[in-house]
Each structure stands twice: as C-alpha cells, then as structure tokens.
UniProtKB/Swiss-Prot annotation:
HAMAP family: DisA (MF_01438). It comes from the Bacteria. Keywords: ATP-binding, DNA damage, DNA repair, DNA-binding, Magnesium, Nucleotide-binding, Nucleotidyltransferase, Transferase. The gene is disA. Belongs to the DisA family. Residues 6-144 form the DAC domain. Its EC number is 2.7.7.85. Homooctamer. It comes from Clostridium botulinum (strain Loch Maree / Type A3). It catalyses: 2 ATP = 3',3'-c-di-AMP + 2 diphosphate. Participates in a DNA-damage check-point that is active prior to asymmetric division when DNA is damaged. DisA forms globular foci that rapidly scan along the chromosomes during sporulation, searching for lesions. When a lesion is present, DisA pauses at the lesion site. This triggers a cellular response that culminates in a temporary block in sporulation initiation. This is DNA integrity scanning protein DisA. One of its GO terms (biological process) is DNA repair. ATP binds at residues 73, 91, 104-108.
Length: 353
C-alpha cells in the first residue's frame, strides 16, 4: 500500500542493474574509456531521428556492444534488449528542446529522451560515468561498492529505528489491554512506523540498483521489518475516526515531509482528532491489530467482530455465547478468540517484566 514514488526510475534501474547483460556491456564501454551513446527502443518515432550508420540487426551481446562503441556514433537497441539494430548512427533530435547538459553526447541523449520518452544512455569518455535519461528523468549510475556501503549504513539505521518502534508498540500493547492508551501513545506509534517504512523504501531502491549483488541486503531487510507496514495500517484502522477511510489516511501520512511527520499534533489531526490534548485524551482501540495476531482468524471474521463490539475491551469482556452470535464465529472459534486474547495479554505482561 506504499505510494510508488520513482516507479519509472526503479524500472530503469532493474533493466541495468549489475548482473544484467545490458549493464555488463555498459561496464565494458566504461572500462575501455571510449564513451558511448545507446538508445533503447525501435519505435518509428526513434528511427526517424536516426541518420546514417550501419544496420546490424544482430543478437545483443555485451562484447558486441563494446566493439561497436569504438565507433563514434550511437547504438540503437531493440526495446526488449534482445537485438542490436544499428551502430555508428547519428541521432538528430529537435534542437529547440531545452537542455542544460554541456557535452554533445549528453545534450543529444537528453533531447532524444525528452522527445521520444525512451531510455537513452550516455557514457562519458573523460568523466567515466554512465548517465541515464528518460523523459525528464536524469540519473547517474553509481558504482556497486558505493551503493552497497550506503545500503549497509541504511540497514544499521533501520535496525535502531525498528528497536525504538518495538519499544513504543510494546508499551502501547500493555496500555491497550489495560484500556488506558492515550492519543499521544497512538500517534507516536504511527509516527515511528512511518519513519521505519521510509528507510525501508530507501533500502529497496538500493536493492533494485544493486541487482544480483543486493540479495543479502534484501534478506536482511526482510528479516528486520516482517509485518511493520501491516501493523502500521492496523494501528490507523484501530484509532482513526469511524467516518474516515484508513487508506486515505495512510496515503496522507506518506505524503508528509520529514518535518511534518515530527509534528504529533498534525498526525492526530490526520486521524481525526483536532484540538484535543495528546497526553490527556484516552482512546480505545477497535481491536483490528490485536485480533489479527490470533492465528487462523479470517479477515472477514475480524471485520464482523469489530462491527459488533466496536472496541477491543468489549471483545475481551464478551461471553462465549455473545461471540458465538457473531456471523462466522462458531463455538470453536469463540474459544480460540477468547483464549488467544488471554494468551496475548499474558505474553505482553510477561515481556514487560
């Protein structure tokens, strides 16, 4: 349910991540210091900009691209990256398209990308860098060792943030079972959950850019976060005003700047509590998050429970007969819910000690 920021850039990075045939070809050109200009796509719009060169129409291979880059012109690849269509070609984009690039190769790449919306790759001969253009996007590919170092640093930061989130959530769990949770406790947990998810999004981008070299980072990330996002959404569902859509609230929280996210009063307004003191306002959870922790309870049954009882404390105080009357709950499931909540409470109180 995360808003997919930079989705287009992520797709580009996947195509040319380390380990892919395209990246191998680009690295070969980079090491040879010949420079190069590659365009990915074979639409009529692209081919109209191509002048001269040799029609190759050969299977793509990193070594072929490397050899063809020794010539001055650009290389045109098919959109599926399976064929080299032509080499040593001159690209003639519309010169009225604005560009802030300086070198001829990069100016051409920028204009072609803006005119056609295709991926164009410029490899600088002197600066030894690979720049990717697509539409208005410009991105400089970085060396894997640099990205790996940043990803590891981000993982260490994430570990600390997850530890803080765990403490905040464990405290909220105790308060929920005692029915003395305040608005301050709730918005702090929502805030911490969003902070963790923002670091996760950053690491996911690094993993995407690392390609097959990012497998270990991906495994560490999966181990660290587990159900953080799901719990964050259930927190919002537990405490937002009943006339509000939790999905809209979650999107709104994601849209906050880093400074706005630090403002707990602003967060409380987003979940529907305006002009009330954070510390003195007691609120009861609906029970989505806690009941969700009980094994083998389907989501539709949880919905029915919340609709019938409206608060977690009412579910806990309900008799087996009252639970049995809820649609989708029989005698066995009523016992599972009662026993499950009792065990959860005992476990949370033990963890406190």
């Amino acid at each position: 349910m995360r808003i997919e920021k930079d989705k287009e850039l992520m797709n580009i990075l996947k195509i040319m991540a380390p380990g892919t045939p395209l990246r191998e070809g680009l690295e070969n050109i980079l090491r040879a210091k010949t420079g190069g200009l590659l365009i990915l796509g074979d639409s009529d719009q692209i081919l109209k900009l191509v002048d001269g060169g040799f029609k190759i129409n050969s299977e793509y291979s990193p070594s072929y691209v490397y050899e063809l880059a020794k010539m001055d012109g650009s290389i045109v690849l098919s959109s599926d990256l399976k064929k080299i269509l032509c080499a040593n070609a001159q690209l003639i984009p519309d010169s009225s398209i604005p560009t802030f690039e300086t070198g001829t190769r990069h100016r051409t790449a920028d204009r072609v990308a803006k005119q056609t919306g295709s991926i164009v790759i410029a490899i600088s001969q002197r600066r030894n860098i690979i720049t990717v253009y697509k539409g208005g996007i410009k991105y400089v590919l970085r060396d894997s060792s640099i990205i790996l170092a940043r990803a590891n640093q981000a993982l260490q930061t994430l570990e600390k943030y997850v530890a803080v989130l765990d403490r905040v959530v464990n405290n909220l769990n105790i308060l929920e079972f005692k029915d003395i949770a305040t608005l301050f406790d709730v918005v702090t947990a929502i805030q911490r959950s969003e902070m963790v998810m923002r670091i996760v999004s950053e690491i996911e981008r690094y993993i995407c850019e690392l390609g097959n070299e990012g497998r270990l980072i991906d495994m560490q990330l999966s181990e660290l976060i587990k159900s953080v996002e799901e719990d964050g959404i259930l927190l919002i569902r537990d405490y937002c005003r009943s006339n509000m859509e939790y999905e809209d609230i979650y999107k709104q929280i994601q849209g906050l700047s880093s400074e706005e996210l630090l403002n707990l009063d602003g967060l409380s307004k987003i979940i529907g509590y305006t002009g009330v003191p954070l510390v003195d306002t007691l609120i009861s959870p609906r029970g989505y998050r806690m009941i969700n922790k009980i094994p083998r309870i389907p989501s539709n049954v949880i919905e029915n429970l919340v609709a019938n009882f409206n608060q977690l404390k009412c579910v806990m105080e309900a008799s087996y007969e009252q639970l049995d009357n809820v649609e989708g709950i029989g005698e066995a499931r009523a016992k599972a819910i009662k026993n499950g909540l009792r065990r959860l409470r005992e476990q949370i109180m033990l963890d406190k000690v």
